[in-house]
C-alpha cells in the first residue's frame, strides 16, 4: 500500500517549478518512505531516457522516463557554480563525484557540454572562464563548505570516508572541462 504523505513545490527559483511527493510504502509491518521529484520543461539534452524497473512482488517491469546522466550532471554542476559559497547542498557535490567516478564510461563529454550549455540557457545563467575558476577556487578554499561536507559525511553512511579534497578534485577537473574548454 502506498500513501502520499506530503506534496510541496520545488525549484521555485526557476520559471518552471516542480513538485516533490513524499510517499510511504507499507507492506505488512514494513514501512519505507521515499520521495519522487516531478518537474516539467527542463532542458533534457539530448532527451529523456527510459529506465525499466523490475517489480519485487510481480513478474513485470515498469518504465520511467528520466534525465540522462549528462543532464543530471549538468544541472548539478550549474547549481554548484551558480550557488558558489552559498551552496548548502552537499548532495550535489557527492552526486557529481559519485557519477563521474562510477559511471564515467557511460558519459559522453560532448553531450555533457551541450547539456551544461542548455541548462545554463534555461536557467538564465552564464559563466565566463575566469568566473568559473574563481568560483571553484573560492569553494576549494572555504572552510565552511568543508565543515558542511564533514557533517554530511558523518550522517550519510554511503559517503564512507570520502574526503572533501577527493570530491573537489573530481568536481573541479570536470567542471573546468565542460564549462571552460
Which ranges hold each PLM region?
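Structured mid-to-C-terminal alpha-helical surface segments
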Residues: 1-181
